A protein has these predicted regions:
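Metal- and O2-centered redox machinery and metal/ROS homeostasis
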Residues: 1-216
């Protein structure tokens, strides 16, 4: 395979990535047409997905395929829990709920984590590299729209304090992708799972869009 895997995976999933980024729900959220409750509900959905991702971090830490990607500075569940406590109050665990689309997403992540390290890498890539990039746009909009303190409670999910140079970190991550210890056929399967991951994420946005109809 002559094309670097990081390039292949980015190119192959471009269409699904664009569809996820341009969902009606996200457009309404970033456009200020939805209230803070919609933002909190989205944060709840993220918690379910990231819990599935990060519950697998320790078991997969020594795996030759997935292990190199598991880095403590990426972990988001503790930050999501701080955000949810701020958004929903100290008893947020009693009211938090997953949309059917979110359950399907989290279940697929857990399934890959349990039986297919390459598939886990696909989900890891689609989430964390997106958070380091487009997530910063969401943080900025949330701070301005709902008055959260800059990089404070409510938007901590988007703050990677352990990543001092995001551009360098993403470059290193792509180097890890290029060096992934799988053959070309497995790489094709990983690319297909990336597409599936974006589709699952788009499904979550669709579910949220049905729950929160824009007033626009």
């Amino acid at each position: 395979m002559d094309t670097p895997f990081s390039t292949l995976i980015r190119t192959a999933s471009h269409e699904q990535h664009t569809e996820a980024e341009t969902s009606t729900f996200m457009g309404d959220l970033l456009g200020g047409r939805l209230g803070v409750d919609a933002y909190a509900r989205y944060t709840e959905q993220l918690w379910f997905v990231y819990r599935a991702l990060e519950d697998a971090a320790k078991p997969l830490a020594d795996d030759p395929v997935a292990g190199p990607f598991i880095q403590p500075e990426l972990l988001r569940v503790p930050e999501l829990e701080r955000d949810l406590a701020h958004l929903r109050g100290p008893d947020w665990r009693e009211t938090v709920s997953a949309l059917p689309q979110t359950r399907a997403y989290a279940e697929r992540v857990a399934e890959c984590a349990a039986s297919w390290p390459g598939g886990y890498v696909a989900h890891h890539y689609t989430r964390y590299l997106g958070d380091l990039s487009g997530g910063q746009i969401i943080r900025d909009k949330a701070e301005k729209t709902w008055g959260f303190a800059r990089k404070g409670d409510g938007v901590r999910f988007y703050v990677f304090e352990g990543v001092s140079n995001p551009a360098a970190f993403k470059r290193h991550y792509r180097e890890l992708l290029d060096a992934i210890a799988v053959d070309d056929l497995e790489k094709q399967r990983v690319v297909a799972e990336c597409k599936a991951a974006f589709a699952l994420n788009t499904g979550v946005f669709r579910g949220l869009g049905e729950e929160f109809r824009s007033a626009a």
